[in-house]
Amino acid sequence: MRIVQLTTDAREHYRQYDKPVPYFGTAPEALLQGFSHLPEVEVHVVSCTQQRMVTPEKIAPNIFFHSLLVPKMGWMRTGYSGCIRAVRRKLREIQPAIVHGQGTERDCAISAVFSGFPNVLTIHGNIRLISKLNQDKPFSFNWLAARLESFTIPRSQGVVCITRYTQRAVLDLAKRTWVLPNAVEAAFFDVRPNPQTDKPPRILCVGVICQRKNQNAFIRALDTLALKQKFEVLFLGSASAAGAYEDEFRSLVQARPWCRHLGVAGRDELRKYFAEATLVALPSLEDNCPMVVLESMAAGVPVVAAHVGGVPDLVEDGITGIFCDPLNPASIASGVEKILTNPSAAEEMALRAKEKAWERFHPKAVAQGHLKIYQEVLSNVS
């Protein structure tokens, strides 16, 4: 089967045009890793860019890469019309059986629905819900992206929902839905947890520093626990240089000797942090299919996660992790304390989580799940 994956090259997103290797984000990268193990498929990754970049012909023996140059006027200000036209031209050359638009907030979804070929979409961020939560101003990026999401969903053959949370959000718009979680890069399954016993327990909190990720409330929630137990909290993620929430975060971290903000970590670094962590915490107010939870489970690291959004699809409370209420400081502290004070039970949960992750999130398993969806779509189209 010949498949096209429309996805964003991170070099375009972050304007890092000098980097020699394309990168498509953690979930799409892991899915491609899975496809590379399926010899029955031929995959073409197509990404639009505003500047020429180094473009390898192949990412894997059965995975080709196409970088399409689109002038600035062909992007969001014109409804991604330039991207749509460039993609259609390339697809006429490739002649795929099916097109998969990864993400609804930029050019990928709308290019998929106007591709002229059978297509499906994956929603990674639930932009309509995020925009509503953030109360975004009219004509801001998220406000426009939310409307783009509403436009594209009903025009596709279906939506691959990475959690039931997403499925519920699109049922009123989508022609068809399937629930299939994101894949996790295979290297995370090779992590061997080895917390440093000669140092305080290490709590890892990974994510962009922002109100939705709720780091400030998480810090305050642990103040009382820090009076009776030693631990350290490491925050990994970018923080805007200007912003009231980010400024408050920096003040909270600086005032507490048990807190550190280490900025953005690369994929190899992240796995090293996982190996040394006692637990990973996700205190978000809203999240769909947080990769840090999937990756923690794959690595065999205990998880304390907020009972919000799509997280209940990923974690079973008391079985493969611990839930907390992100609006209740006592609940957050209690979840963390359960892991810190009962390491044997925490280890058992982490082992069960790793088993579940092998079944549900391994790249090959998720790629095979996608292949079944594509076959269903094509059987209905024909």
What are these regions (language model features)?
Residues V4, V160, P195-K213, I219-D223, ...:
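Conserved donor-binding/catalytic core segment of Leloir-type glycosyltransferases
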Residues S140-G158:
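Membrane-proximal helix-turn-helix segments that form the acceptor-binding/catalytic region
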Residues Y165, A183:
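Carbohydrate-associated surface elements
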Residues Q229-W258, D268-R271, A345:
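Short, structured helix-loop element that forms part of the nucleotide-activated donor/catalytic region
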Residues P302-A305:
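Short hydrophobic beta-strand element within catalytic cores of glycosyltransferases
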Residues D317-G318, I322-P329, K338-S344:
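Conserved acidic donor-binding segment of nucleotide-sugar-dependent glycosyltransferases
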